[in-house]
Swiss-Prot record:
Subcellular location: Cytoplasm
Pathway listed: Porphyrin-containing compound metabolism; protoporphyrin-IX biosynthesis; 5-aminolevulinate from L-glutamyl-tRNA(Glu): step 2/2
Cofactor(s) listed: pyridoxal 5'-phosphate
Coiled coil: none
Native species: Alkaliphilus metalliredigens (strain QYMF)
GO terms of molecular function: glutamate-1-semialdehyde 2,1-aminomutase activity; pyridoxal phosphate binding; transaminase activity
Protein name according to UniProt: Glutamate-1-semialdehyde 2,1-aminomutase
Gene3D superfamilies: Aspartate Aminotransferase, domain 1, Type I PLP-dependent aspartate aminotransferase-like (Major domain)
UniProt-listed InterPro entries: 4pyrrol_synth_GluAld_NH2Trfase (IPR004639), Aminotrans_3 (IPR005814), Aminotrans_3_PPA_site (IPR049704), PyrdxlP-dep_Trfase (IPR015424), PyrdxlP-dep_Trfase_major (IPR015421), PyrdxlP-dep_Trfase_small (IPR015422)
Length: 440
């Protein structure tokens, strides 16, 4: 039986119309506008566990999870309790606090490559400052990034990017000057020969290579193990730094991040999302020798009014402590994600729908293409019109997915069998509806 909900969006529609008068596009991050899936966005009022609720009272199983931070689900009781306690003592001081030390010790203890860490306010700040540090440390100017990898919206990294830049067809943003762009070299993801040729030609000028070890902003696209180790070797050979952007994967795919899966130690690592427990945060860290080039002990400048603020540090420390003290969480996340992937695969096989799947731990993406997705080119073969219809079919059945083909499904500790089973059921109903549509 079709369990499609009767959704009402009157209040969300009014709020969106009003927002468009005072906020560009009505949203504070482009993907939230839902333009790529052909509808206006519901305005979310609250979340609890695996669910979110919009302003019209509609209830959804949430697989966005605030774009990754909420690995424990919405409003985890311990996180909420600790945040309430901090609110009674002060929200920000612009001065050192003990909680900054505690989370720094926890992160450096979990990630062997990170001997020192600096807190900032966003993933964009983390990657931007990590590159400044790499340039200051090496005395070189050029950086290498990979097509389809998204590292935030700083000028030098908005070149052939993923995430919203890919969704909205703006791989090279206006406003990025030629002088900035000339120091950014782009390369094909998972292409060993390509990166070797770049270093052969310009290796002595390259300060760093920055990469998402598991690209989560063109779906879910992991590095091959061979490519990962080739990157580590060639950067070492040429004296360039290897920077892992683990804003999405850090503490998500394992407690040691993606680098623990590949058994590689990058020189610098960028973090965000989970380490803030749902509050704004970013961080970058690495070898002591490199990190001590940062001010106030070194010449490379970085600062932030709200960096390390007690609220974000408390939410992050609480979240990381729960993950650290409950090692079985990652095994359970793997089982849940595996069950979901298996259910999806069975559906597309039965309905004869072209789809391929990539999954690492609790990050999952179903691409509507026959191709095995390994880079931007293969990701771009996905049928975005089918995804758009799939998204709307799922939303109408109470399942909230990313409003773009080129993002990730995040499974949280709060998702249980009830939610997983309902999601699989909704996917079958929705995809069957799409399959029976003669226009597809």
């Amino acid at each position: 039986m079709d369990k499609r909900s009767i959704m009402k969006y009157e209040r969300s529609q009014k709020l969106f119309e009003a927002s468009q008068e005072v906020i560009p596009g009505g949203v504070n991050s482009p993907v939230r506008a839902f333009s790529s899936v052909g509808m206006n966005p519901p305005f979310i009022k609250r979340g609890k566990g695996a669910y979110i609720y919009d302003e019209d009272g509609n209830k959804y199983i949430d697989y966005v999870g605030s774009w990754g931070p909420l690995i424990l689900g919405h409003c985890h009781p311990e996180v909420v309790e600790n945040l309430k306690a901090v609110l009674e003592t002060g929200t920000s001081f612009g001065a050192p606090t003990e909680i900054e030390l505690k989370i720094a010790e926890l992160i450096t203890g979990a990630i062997p490559s990170v001997e020192m860490i600096r807190m900032v306010n966003s993933g964009t700040e983390a990657t931007m400052t990590a590159l400044r540090l790499a340039r200051g440390y090496t005395g070189r100017n050029k950086i290498v990034k990979f097509n389809g990898n998204y590292h935030g919206h700083s000028d030098g990294l908005l070149i052939k990017a993923g995430s919203g830049a890919l969704t909205h067809g703006v791989p090279n943003s206006p406003g990025v000057t030629p002088d900035v762009a000339k120091n950014t070299i782009t390369a094909k993801y998972n292409d060993i020969e390509g990166i070797m040729e770049i270093f052969k030609q310009q290796g002595e000028e390259i300060a760093a290579v920055i990469i998402e070890p598991i690209a989560g902003n063109m779906g879910v696209v992991p590095m091959t193990n061979k490519f990962a180790h080739a990157l580590r070797k060639i950067t070492e050979d040429y004296g360039a730094l290897l920077i892992f952007d683990e804003v999405m994967t850090g503490f998500r795919v394992s407690f040691g991040g993606a680098q623990s899966l590949y058994q590689i130690k990058p020189d610098l690592t960028c973090f965000g999302k989970i380490i803030g427990g749902g509050l704004p945060v970013g961080a970058f860290g690495g070898k002591r020798e490199i990190m001590e080039h940062l001010s106030p002990v070194g010449p490379v400048y970085q600062a932030g009014t709200l960096s390390g603020n007690p609220l974000a540090m408390t939410a992050g420390y609480t979240t990381l402590s729960i993950l650290h003290n409950n090692s079985g969480i990652y095994e359970e996340l793997e089982k849940k994600a595996q069950k979901l992937e298996k259910g999806f695969k069975k559906i597309v096989k039965e309905l004869q729908i072209d789809a391929s799947f990539n999954r690492v731990g609790s990050m999952l993406c179903m691409f509507f293409t026959k191709e095995k997705v390994s880079d931007l080119e293969t990701a771009s073969t996905s049928n975005t019109e089918i995804y758009s219809q799939y998204f709307r079919a799922m939303l109408s059945r109470g399942v909230y997915l990313a409003p773009t083909q080129f993002e990730t499904m995040f499974i949280s500790d709060a998702h249980g069998d009830v939610e997983i089973n309902r999601t699989i059921e909704a996917a079958y109903e929705g995809l069957k509806e799409i399959r029976n549509n003669p226009s597809i």
